[in-house]
Amino acid sequence: MKVNIIYSTLSGHTKKLADAIGEVLGVEPQNLKEDNGYYDCDLLFIGGGIYSGALSPELDGYIEFLNPQNTPKAAVFMSSVSEDYQKSNLAGKLREKGIEIVGEFSCNGSFLVMKMFHPNKKDIASVKEFAADVATKVLKNN
């Protein structure tokens, strides 16, 4: 099974989550600012932060080019200082493209003094468990 991890980050929080997922799956995460290639895969882990209730422009742009025939399944991971995860609608945008969502993960991110030290060790452990669970579920159903 071919797995890719794509993320966009302004603060570095999503990179921490992507690196943890990559560690579990043995996959090198790709930062959209450095590599926005559209690679075919069986399962895409895609993540970003929520900034004023919206996704980053890089992530929005990347989604536009995804094709469900080349990327049939995705798992979403996000961080946010507020509860704006649902406002971003990352999973909804992927579903609109015809991509099956096989998992969603969100945790706190920090901004200035709000929710300092997030993502923390507990968040990292949780995203690792999420990644392992999603990969196991997808492998079992293939």
List where the protein language model places each region.
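FMN-binding flavodoxin-like domain, especially the glycine-rich phosphate-binding loop
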Residues: V3, T9, H13-E28, K33, ...
